[in-house]
């Protein structure tokens, strides 16, 4: 009975650590923000900035 409880607790701890690791791996997606600034109607420019991206600033 005690061995069974130990096995259940260990498997729960291992599963919880795996879920935490998976969440940390994918957390970078939530940090990416997109900022779009549009100029007045007289100018047709748009600037897109991606934070955390290697692409840098791109103007269209």
UniProtKB/Swiss-Prot annotation:
- Report the domain of life of the source organism: Bacteria
* Organism for this UniProt entry: Thermotoga maritima (strain ATCC 43589 / DSM 3109 / JCM 10099 / NBRC 100826 / MSB8)
User: What protein name does the entry list?
Assistant: Uncharacterized protein TM_1323/TM_1333
């Amino acid at each position: 009975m005690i061995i069974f409880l130990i096995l259940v607790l260990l498997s729960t701890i291992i599963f919880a650590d795996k879920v935490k690791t998976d969440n940390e791996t994918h957390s970078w997606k939530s940090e990416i923000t997109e900022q779009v600034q549009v100029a007045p109607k007289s100018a047709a420019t748009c600037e897109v900035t991606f934070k955390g991206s290697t692409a840098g600033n791109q103007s269209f």
